[in-house]
């Protein structure tokens, strides 16, 4: 007679089904013994000490696998561990070993709350600044962002770009020692500087938030797409109109580069959580916030079978971050055109609820995209992700310019763009600018606008809920449905005038 295994060693809900699935594209796989990235949420019951729970989990890991097993867990936040495990190893871990005893399972379940997939996330101004009335606000209220610090969780920021030199955007004493690289390196200790940007996305986003074109315009080269006679796009150079400048929305704000995207524009949920935890740690060192807001111009499709909208580990960590007084701005995603349905007659129908994570986070300010200077005419960008969330909440919260936005260019973003290629006779520090599109750029406009607002309405620092409500209440209605435009187009001038 075959012995019946003891009941209870595995709770059905403790392991995400997605973790055990084969061939899931948005989970990191090493190719080594079918190991995949998992995010283990530790069980922190009331009264439990996080350090003691972490030590208990590491002892469990060693007892189950020994010293020659899978790679050691990596702490990414006080109650999250990043692990690389095979499906069999995951099962063994939550059972407390190979024997599958009730005692072993109870030990494991006393330490592990849930095993989540470590999802892969990807990266999603001269005329657009006036669209949100940032230029008028600077003239009227002197809202240039001075004294405000914003963290950019992205592919890094190229500190060598002249755009960030005039106002010490990255080198002021308030931020000089705060930059960090959280990207995963195959060789520990060989991480790249957070003030370099091979991918180029982070520098472009950062340039929309803060910084300013150098006064010496002889070093300025701006590339934009100009249709040819055959209606094909071609990169050409353009000049600034007389009296115009290229500036971030909050030119005098300071930025903290938290590099989370690798050179291909990818990152992991665990990496994001690690960076978010770092912001909390920085802000816990003293009475006043050192980092006032964060910008996340990235995201990924999320599996609704795994958790309700806004309840993923990453979304929950962002909600916790806003609870500490930090304003969180997130791009809605560029999936608005990816969910089209074709009817029997060949007609195409749009599909709603395409907001990507972490744009589903309830307390985050989630931003969609509109045309850079004619938003009333063209409305919401066709591929800007639409609401509502799948649990019925309205998203996005706001829209901002996101089409063909000119900002600082570097790395892969300008590679192959002939007009920006180095040439004989160029000064050594040419300021190169280029157009890019997406809700990544829209989120950066909102981050810059809020940084500008906080620089003159300092009583709102540390009040993310009040700031979100104020900007939504003061937004300009574009006459589109709230699932497309949210509260409307951000209006910095009206937000300042209403307080």
Question: Which sequence ranges carry the predicted segments?
Answer:
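Mature extracellular/periplasmic domains of secretome proteins
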Residues: 96-99, 103-109, 138-147, 197, ...
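Active-site-adjacent substrate-recognition loops and nearby beta-strands
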Residues: 129-132, 138, 164-165, 272, ...
């Amino acid at each position: 007679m075959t012995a019946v295994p003891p009941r209870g060693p595995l709770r059905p809900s403790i392991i995400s089904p997605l973790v055990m699935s084969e061939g899931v594209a948005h989970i990191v796989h090493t190719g080594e013994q079918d190991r995949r990235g998992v995010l283990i949420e530790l069980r922190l019951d009331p009264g439990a000490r996080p350090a003691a729970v972490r030590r208990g989990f590491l002892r469990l890991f060693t007892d189950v696998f020994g010293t020659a097993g899978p790679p050691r867990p990596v702490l990414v936040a006080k109650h999250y561990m990043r692990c690389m495990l095979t499906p069999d190893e995951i099962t063994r871990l939550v059972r407390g070993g190979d024997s599958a005893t009730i005692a072993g399972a109870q030990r494991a379940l006393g330490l592990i709350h849930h095993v989540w997939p470590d999802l892969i996330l990807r990266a999603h101004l001269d005329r657009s600044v006036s669209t949100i009335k940032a230029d008028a606000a600077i003239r009227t209220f002197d809202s240039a962002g001075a004294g405000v610090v914003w963290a950019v969780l992205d592919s890094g920021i190229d500190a060598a770009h002249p755009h960030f030199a005039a106002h010490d955007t990255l080198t002021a004493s308030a931020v000089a020692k705060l930059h960090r690289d959280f990207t995963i390196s195959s060789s520990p200790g060989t991480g790249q500087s957070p003030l370099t940007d091979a991918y180029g996305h982070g520098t472009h986003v950062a340039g929309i938030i803060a910084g300013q074109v150098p006064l010496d315009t002889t070093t300025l080269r701006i590339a934009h797409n100009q249709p040819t006679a055959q209606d094909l796009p071609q990169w050409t150079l353009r000049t600034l109109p007389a009296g115009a400048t290229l500036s971030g929305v909050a030119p005098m704000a300071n930025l903290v580069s938290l590099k989370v995207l690798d050179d291909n524009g990818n990152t992991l949920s665990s990496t994001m959580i690690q960076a978010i935890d770092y912001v909390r740690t920085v802000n816990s060192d003293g009475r006043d916030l050192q980092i006032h807001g964060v910008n996340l111009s990235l995201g990924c499709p999320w599996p609704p079978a795994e958790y309700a909208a806004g309840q993923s580990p990453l979304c929950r960590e962002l909600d916790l971050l806003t609870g500490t007084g930090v304003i969180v701005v997130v791009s809605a995603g560029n999936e608005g055109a990816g969910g089209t349905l074709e009817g029997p007659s060949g007609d195409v129908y749009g599909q709603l609820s395409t907001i990507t994570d972490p744009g589903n986070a309830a307390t985050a300010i989630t931003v969609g995209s509109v045309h850079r200077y004619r938003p009333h005419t063209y409305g919401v960008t066709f591929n800007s992700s639409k609401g509502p969330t799948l649990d019925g909440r309205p998203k996005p919260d706001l829209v901002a310019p996101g089409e063909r936005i000119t900002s600082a260019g570097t790395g892969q973003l300008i590679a192959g763009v002939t007009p920006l290629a180095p040439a004989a006779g160029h000064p050594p520090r040419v300021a190169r600018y280029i157009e890019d599109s997406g809700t990544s750029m829209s989120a950066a406009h909102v981050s810059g606008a809020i940084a500008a607002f906080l620089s003159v309405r300092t009583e709102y620092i540390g009040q993310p809920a009040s700031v979100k409500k104020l900007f939504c209440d003061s937004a300009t209605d574009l006459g589109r449905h709230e699932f497309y435009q949210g509260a409307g187009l951000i209006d910095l001038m009206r937000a300042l005038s209403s307080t």
